[in-house]
Amino acid sequence: MLTGRRWKQLVMAAGLGFVVSAADSVASDWVRFRGPNGTGISTDSEPLPVEFGEGKNLKWKAALPGAGVSCPIVVGDRVFVTCYSGYGVSRQDAGDMQSLKRHMVCLDRADGKVLWERTIDAVLPEDEYSGMGVPEHGYASHTPVSDGERVYAFFGKSGVYCWDLEGKELWKASAGTGSDDRAWGSSSSPILAGQVLIVPAGPESRAVLGYDSKSGKQLWKAEGDSLGNVWGTPALSVVDDQRTDVVIGAPYEIWGINPATGKLRWYCSAMETDQFNSSVLIDGGTIYAVEGRGGGSIAIRAGGKGDVSGSNVVWSGNDSNRFSTPLLYEGRMYLISGGLVKCVNAADGKEIFQGRLTAGGPAAGGPPAGGPGGGGRGRGGFGGGRGGSDYASPVLGDGKIYYVNRAGDIYVLKPGAALEVLAKNRLTADQEDFSATPAISNGQIFFRSSRHLYCVSAQ
């Protein structure tokens, strides 16, 4: 078993003692993967629609310059999303790797108009678009992050980029050019901890990297033997008013890292799996993780020092997800995988209910579910197949849970002690891949497909 003792601290920052808050810069903004500290929960008071689709509560639809599964983020009146083009867009013909480009796109949230776009040549060679890895997600899988003044994007081997909100490039830096053992590509998204940009560059460097967010200077580099098999995104755990930990899941363990220095503060033995696909979830003083491939689930009390396996585990269980991260709301944790919804008590991990997603009413704006969502795509396909239907994670706003599968079926659920499907919606009759987790901000929901960005609101 890999242990936290095999974490290797390589470069330490000096003079960066600070306390980090897990709160985002503006409450109504959605500035990172899954919104405020990765919880997937919007605290906005604006109403959100139950039913929507073509001709109903669809505010706008904007064409994107390429594919991707990264999620949109919302900063003030702007929406940011990353894409890729030129290579690996079609399974039938991957094309020439030399043509691979990355894109950062900034859109006006009012009407979907593109305000600016930046195109980046890929650092080559990339992992090939073949097999069961990269074709599942492509080359724009990392969700950007913003501090309200700048926007940061991680493009794997092509590096880390920082722009101001007007599109001026402020800095760029390498995060390594390695690959994971399976050459599946990378997808972990960057987060901000105060002035430190945290980049989980597992496949690229077998490391978590810390950069000064204003200058791009690398502050520290911390290696872990198992980070090459990590595809999840960290979150911040506020232990007290003097201490915040960066928490990330790794094969067999959960780690708590000092964001100022990259030093490992604590580790906890966890799921029995050699890869970590989902992201940790933090609620108050408890850290939750659910992993796929039979890895199981765990709840850990925040804080501690060194090996906390014998002292901080609140409960552990056998629940598993595939890729998506659970949603925790009012003491209940909702897991969605393979068309099944399972709800467990966050306090003890005991099951509350389990049920299969079915329509709560006629689908709006499209044909019935079950058609392909991007062609016959690996492990059961994107078209509602049992293997490939779940990629995005559930989010919550206006007291309702929103979940989209890869085929583009969008379920609206009522949280509670039993499964209640309020509606099933579709935004398009076309075959598009909806693998990205939605973003919620100020009464609007943003859904990203392989071709378009959609804005839904109660009109």
Where are these regions (language model features)?
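Bacterial N-terminal signal peptides that target proteins for export
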Residues: 1-12
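Bacterial N-terminal signal peptides
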Residues: 10-21
